């Protein structure tokens, strides 16, 4: 074993019939963690079902069905390798919680792969007003997925097949709309592929001799290549934010006999280590960390991405709960958010949203009702420019800047300061009706808080 490869997360987006499953299935099948036995089983079933042409999508359909039924799938199935990376596909749309997962940031994607279908009429349907191509791309941008790869799929079904003219026509159109939502086309590889036949997936295709390859220009270094796999290999790996102040939203708080209170959660930014004096918001409780554990082993320090449990002195289960945020009391400690301003995009609300609307917000691990106190402005969701001041309502498809007031104590942050604590989903009627990114927060100065004895000594 040489040096471990870097882990990166991708999200695969695009219109419903663009071939996301086939393309993803192909990568997992050829470069991934599915063993030969499973593949043979799938192939046999596909043949018996008359899907003899064996679409790679079959692999994904099987996995999805298991995922939907709540069977935990061997997660290796959603991974594949490139020369440089272990790639995890963190979600594929079509999964009902896709949008919620993307926002509450079960994991943050490092790159989005936008799949567009090049068949006659197919591309047009996907990019039309009702298509999902734009919505998914806009979501990725809004939620801070900075890198993108565009896979122009189904090149085998253009007229004539593998048409250079059609490819050029499509990338011109895609470049124009992704530029409008805030991506720079010069940094994006455009790869003509057939996810089904494998053209330009792992090896350059003989069917598209006209294709000279993709190239990107970016400050981290230029890159070029011919295949989708090479494009994935050129993703810029994320900088894990260890240098930021600590933010650790709690997923649970356990009471363990003989040990005491053990909060559990994922470090989003900064580091946590024994001896640190931490403050929990919004409760404003300050105490000392006795020990930090991951997988039952004690750690000298936990970093972003680590799921840890840690032991606290003199804090009861009543003091803190899921949704509380742990921070370093000496370095920009987290505080209760009295109100916050956010840019929201209304996605599928049957009526309209006006001042006074009070749905539940899912932000990091918190799940709290917040009131839309004021609609400040309506903005063009494609350009972000203001189109109207103090609108009466926002309806599906609209974007706006709003002021929100939590109905119970809550701790959130501006997206630019702490991204994982600065994006949220608005849930109502058992679905995601809007998504938002927090622009600014009015914080409580938190003068009245509880400080344990050990924390006072440390001061």
Swiss-Prot record:
Entry keywords, A to Z: Cytoplasm, Elongation factor, GTP-binding, Nucleotide-binding, Phosphoprotein, Protein biosynthesis
Membrane-spanning parts: none
Annotated region described as G5, given as residue ranges: 194-196
Region ranges (G4): 153-156
PTM-bearing positions, type 5-glutamyl glycerylphosphorylethanolamine: 301, 374
Region G3, residue ranges: 91-94
Top-level taxon of the source organism: Eukaryota
GO molecular function: GTP binding; GTPase activity; translation elongation factor activity
GO CC term, one of those recorded: cytoplasm
Chain intervals for the UniProt region annotation (G1): 14-21
PROSITE patterns per the UniProt record, alphabetical: G_TR_1 (PS00301), G_TR_2 (PS51722)
Region (G2): 70-74
Domain tr-type G: 5-242
Subcellular location: Cytoplasm
Family statement drawn from the similarity comment of this UniProt entry: Belongs to the TRAFAC class translation factor GTPase superfamily. Classic translation factor GTPase family. EF-Tu/EF-1A subfamily.
Described purpose of this protein according to its UniProt entry: This protein promotes the GTP-dependent binding of aminoacyl-tRNA to the A-site of ribosomes during protein biosynthesis.
Name used for this protein in its record: Elongation factor 1-alpha 4
UniProt organism field: Oscheius tipulae
């Amino acid at each position: 074993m040489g040096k471990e490869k870097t882990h990166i997360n991708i999200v695969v987006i695009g219109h419903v019939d663009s071939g996301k499953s086939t393309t993803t299935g192909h990568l997992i099948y050829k470069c991934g963690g599915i063993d030969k036995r499973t593949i043979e089983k799938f192939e046999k079933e596909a043949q018996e079902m008359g899907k003899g042409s064996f679409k790679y999508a079959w692999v994904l359909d099987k996995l999805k069905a298991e995922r939907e039924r709540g069977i935990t799938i061997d997660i290796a199935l959603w991974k594949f390798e490139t020369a440089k990376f272990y790639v995890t596909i963190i979600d594929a749309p079509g999964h009902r919680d896709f949008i919620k997962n993307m926002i509450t940031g079960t994991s943050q994607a490092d790159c989005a792969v936008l799949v567009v279908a090049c068949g006659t009429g197919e591309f047009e349907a996907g990019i039309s007003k009702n298509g999902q191509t734009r919505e998914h791309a806009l979501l990725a941008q809004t939620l801070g997925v900075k890198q993108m790869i565009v896979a122009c799929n189904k090149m085998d079904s253009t007229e004539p097949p593998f048409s250079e003219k059609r490819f050029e026509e499509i990338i011109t159109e895609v470049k124009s709309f992704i530029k409008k939502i805030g991506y720079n086309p010069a940094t994006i590889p455009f790869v003509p592929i057939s996810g089904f036949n494998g053209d330009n997936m792992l090896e350059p295709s003989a069917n598209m001799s006209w294709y000279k390859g993709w190239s990107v220009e970016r400050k981290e270094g230029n890159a070029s290549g011919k295949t989708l796999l090479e494009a994935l290999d050129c993703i810029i790996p994320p900088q894990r934010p260890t240098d930021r102040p600590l933010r650790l939203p709690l997923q649970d708080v356990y009471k363990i006999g003989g040990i005491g209170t053990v909060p559990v959660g994922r470090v989003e930014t900064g580091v946590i280590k024994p001896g640190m004096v931490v403050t929990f918001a919004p409760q404003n409780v300050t105490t000392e960390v006795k020990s930090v554990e991951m997988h039952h082993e004690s750690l000298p320090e936990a970093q972003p991405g680590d799921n840890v449990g840690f032991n606290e002195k003199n804090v009861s289960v009543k003091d803190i709960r899921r949704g509380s945020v742990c921070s370093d009391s000496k370095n920009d400690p987290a505080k209760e958010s009295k109100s916050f301003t956010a840019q929201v995009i209304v996605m599928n609300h049957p009526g309209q949203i006006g001042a006074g609307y009070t749905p539940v917000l899912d932000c990091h691990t918190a799940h709290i009702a917040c009131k839309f106190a004021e609609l400040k402005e309506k903005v063009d969701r494609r350009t972000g420019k203001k189109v109207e001041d103090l609108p009466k309502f926002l309806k599906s498809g609209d974007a706006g800047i709003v002021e929100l007031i939590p109905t119970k104590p809550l701790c959130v942050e501006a997206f630019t300061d702490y991204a994982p604590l600065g994006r949220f989903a608005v849930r109502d009627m058992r679905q995601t009706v809007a998504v938002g990114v927090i622009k600014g927060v009015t914080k409580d100065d938190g003068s009245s808080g509880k400080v344990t004895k050990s924390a006072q000594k440390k001061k």
